[in-house]
């Protein structure tokens, strides 16, 4: 097995571990946030009245502390999820790797469901606490010990009206999380259907087309691939040092191919290629004959007059009849 093929399962397994860690941080932060909100509301709204003297002070400290820790965990998980998504896009992942995170659903869908359930439960508890706990009643008022304490004998439980307002608002936030979960699930289903339809279309395009005309069947070959396929374009884009040779929408010009389409060669090969191109243009038959200069003799050719005299002396001698 090649190292690249062995590295891919390790990378997928590491991504799964990171996804599980992010999910745990989300759930832990959401639970702490809701518990902190409930403790804060109960500590600051109910424990500040004299009819409930047994409310400990620790609730007023533990509530905001839990809420802050939970909010920090949620923010940390969110930032880590963004980093994982960017790393996946840089590696060329087009689809979400967490589509089947838990029970065949995506991680974001599960997170939105958990958030919605927690907020919905918290809002209902706050609403029940604000509605069913009696407020502003005479049973909660202390009896005055003397005439000077008559001003302190007024009922003090009217502060639960804020719980009656905050409860439905938190329930509404929980319902909004359910709506977001439904939208994310629908988007995931649409993306999966589009991907499957695209694959089916590519398979159908690569198959030959049969057309029946009367009793004869005409088979048309599949169309040729595109001039610049997406796979080659992405491979060129990912490979370093090829930024100047990226494919464009139109085919490259002749001059760009002639100038930039050469491969680096040695000096001897380059000189031989130049000689071949030059002698091809000049019309010579072979490069060997044109490259070697002819050997010139050291003696000078005879003069033109000497040639005429030699020809004149040769003709009379040849015209005389031979003796018997």
Swiss-Prot record:
Subcellular location as annotated: Membrane
Compositionally biased intervals (Low complexity): 229-239
Stretch list, region Disordered: 229-248, 279-304
Keyword list, A-Z: Membrane, Transmembrane, Transmembrane helix
UniProt-listed InterPro entries: TMEM171
Membrane topology, as annotated: Multi-pass membrane protein
Disulfide bonds: none
Any single Pfam family the record assigns to this protein: TMEM171
GO cellular component assignments: membrane
Residue ranges with Polar residues bias: 279-291
Keyword Metal-binding among record annotations: no
Source organism superkingdom: Eukaryota
Transmembrane regions: 22-42, 57-77, 113-133, 160-180
Metal-binding as UniProt keyword: no
Name used for this protein in its record: Transmembrane protein 171
Organism of derivation: Homo sapiens (Human)
Gene: TMEM171
């Amino acid at each position: 097995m090649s190292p690249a093929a062995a590295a891919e399962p390790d990378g997928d397994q590491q991504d799964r571990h990171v996804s599980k860690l992010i999910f745990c941080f989300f759930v832990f932060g959401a639970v702490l946030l809701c518990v902190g909100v409930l403790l804060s509301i109960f500590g600051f709204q109910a424990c500040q009245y004299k009819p409930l003297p047994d409310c400990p002070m620790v609730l007023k400290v533990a509530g905001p502390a839990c809420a802050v820790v939970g909010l920090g965990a949620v923010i940390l998980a969110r930032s880590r999820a963004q980093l994982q998504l960017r790393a996946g896009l840089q590696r060329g992942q087009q689809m979400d790797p967490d589509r089947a995170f838990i029970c065949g659903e995506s991680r974001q869908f599960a997170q939105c469901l958990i958030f919605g359930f927690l907020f919905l439960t918290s809002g209902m508890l706050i609403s029940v606490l604000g509605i069913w706990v009696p407020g502003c009643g005479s049973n909660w008022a202390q009896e005055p010990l003397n005439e000077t304490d008559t001003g302190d004998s007024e009922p003090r439980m009217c502060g639960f009206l804020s719980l009656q307002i905050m409860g439905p608002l938190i329930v509404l936030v929980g319902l909004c999380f359910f709506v977001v979960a439904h939208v994310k699930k629908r988007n995931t289903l649409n993306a999966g259907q589009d991907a499957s339809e695209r694959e089916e279309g590519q398979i159908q395009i690569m198959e030959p087309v049969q057309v029946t005309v009367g009793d004869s069947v005409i088979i048309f070959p599949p169309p040729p691939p595109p001039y610049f396929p997406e796979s080659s374009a992405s491979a060129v884009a990912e490979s370093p040092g090829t930024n100047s040779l990226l494919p464009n929408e139109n085919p490259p010009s002749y001059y760009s191919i002639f100038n930039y389409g050469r491969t680096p060669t040695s000096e001897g090969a380059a000189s031989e290629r130049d000689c071949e191109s030059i002698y091809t243009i000049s019309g010579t038959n072979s490069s060997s004959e044109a490259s070697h200069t002819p050997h010139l003799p050291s003696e000078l050719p005879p003069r033109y007059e000497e040639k005429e005299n030699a020809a004149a002396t040769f003709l009379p001698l040849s015209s005389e009849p031979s003796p018997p």
